[in-house]
Amino acid sequence: MKINHKYEFDDDVASICESTAALTEGCRLPVRMHKTDDWPLAEIVSIKELDGRRQFYVHYVDFNKRLDEWVNEEDLYTRKVQFPRRDGSQTGTSTGVTTPQRHHSLAGSVSRPTSPQHPGSGALAAIPQTPTGASGSVPPPAGIPNSVAPPGTPSSGGELVNGNNLAAALQKRINRKRKNHGGSAHGHHSLTSQQQQSHPHPTTPQTPTATPVHVTGDGLISGAANDDGDGSQDGKTPTPRQSGSMVTHQDDVVTRMKNVEMIELGRHRIKPWYFSPYPQELCQMPCIYICEFCLKYRKSRKCLERHLSKCNLRHPPGNEIYRKHTISFFEIDGRKNKVYAQNLCLLAKLFLDHKTLYYDTDPFLFYVMTEFDSRGFHIVGYFSKEKESTEDYNVACILTMPPYQRKGYGKLLIEFSYELSKFEGKTGSPEKPLSDLGLLSYRSYWAQTILEIFISQNPSTDGEKPTITINDICECTSIKKEDVISTLQNLNLINYYKGQYIVCINRVIIEQHRRAMDKRKIRIDSKCLHWTPKDWSKRSK
């Protein structure tokens, strides 16, 4: 057994089970990860009692939240536990026998509801309200438990932040932002993204050796070499905008926990990764059944069958603007097809972390990619974009459904978004910061697209090496200048040689690029795109 953080392991199961009665929300200890023999450090987010046994919802520290899970008492290693303190002082460690003083509000088992109440027609924002106790469970104590602390909140001194202090600080910050931005952070759709992994710093360019391919250009960087479109060069995580579709994420215990056990979408049964504000009565069911055409949700397969007998849709609503072979794209107006857009956001939230979901979809367009067969058009993925973006964002949110991941559909969505930008005659970029998976996909797409431009360059008639500028690359690809520069830096292709910047590509990079391109069997064909850009500033949204 591999226990991280140098914790010793005690095989006495009885003592472990006996000591778990002292554990409260906010405690940190090694936990056995599901289907592995690893014991990473985890934080207890919530506790419930089921059939006389306590179960613990844990978040593995430094791991993605999609790995969070319910574990049993025997999966906890209680030899060393970090207990949260009421006063927020230095967190101590306990070795099995010693237990902290427990507060009355946390005595016994505390079971939190799995989902907030679903907002009615009068409440558009899908922000969780104060939850009510689920049937058959003990309602949570009044106020915020002092032992609850989100992961990542401990200070550099090893302290765990007190729950009440955290709530007060969070409320102050929210009020301050409202005052600064005039409340613009509210009333907008969406799915904001926080970067989940640090960006590597570009290595220092060296004098190039003899390489077979050179692409040069005077003033290639022209003072903009330090600009990184995704904030990767300075090592800082960029802050999301407080307007448009980028709004702050309000983290609490309810939204930190997965509230849907399983969904059935067409032929696929999918286990969700994150919280989504579906109605609470549905979240208590073992599975939520979703119509793959209109995305309406039902509590049982029988209810879904009745719905399918009445549902006339066999494809997403809106206009089909692209079709090649079995792949189609539909453009959906968030104002004209509001119910579908809201259901799409609910579905996407199950697989997108660090998002705050709002039901105001009017300012957005949704582009849904489908795969066609004899039964209809089945959703593969989608991306959304603002009708009017002041910062030239061509993607607000992007998702490939889990059954279709690792098949090239993610890059196809990205390629289609840039194809739309080409039709609009401008460069575009995704809203930043990107998620971990989104960052990997975009960096891979940018690298392959830019290398494809370089390799296709031919020497001039007099035998001189080909030249190209950053602006030329942007014009050919519709990739924003900052993203082009950051990609060249991440690939370490930019070198300063004899008074000018040059891009050096060796045979190894060329072979790697060709192997990667061979895997991209599906590409966007601009001839199959039938679409005319609209000037949304001159029409009602």
Swiss-Prot record:
The keyword Phosphoprotein does not apply. Residues 234-248 have a biased composition (Polar residues). Keywords: Acetylation, Acyltransferase, Chromatin regulator, DNA damage, DNA repair, Metal-binding, Nucleus, Transcription, Transcription regulation, Transferase, Zinc, Zinc-finger. Residues 89-99, 190-216 have a biased composition (Low complexity). Residues 178-189 have a biased composition (Basic residues). One of its GO terms (biological process) is chromatin remodeling. It is found in: Nucleus. It catalyses: L-lysyl-[protein] + acetyl-CoA = N(6)-acetyl-L-lysyl-[protein] + CoA + H(+). Its EC number is 2.3.1.48. The modification N6-acetyllysine is found at K355. Residues 24-77 form the Tudor-knot domain. Catalytic subunit of the Tip60 chromatin-remodeling complex which is involved in DNA repair. Upon induction of DNA double-strand breaks, acetylates phosphorylated histone H2AV in nucleosomes on 'Lys-4' and exchanges it with unmodified H2AV. Belongs to the MYST (SAS/MOZ) family. This is Histone acetyltransferase Tip60. It comes from Drosophila melanogaster.
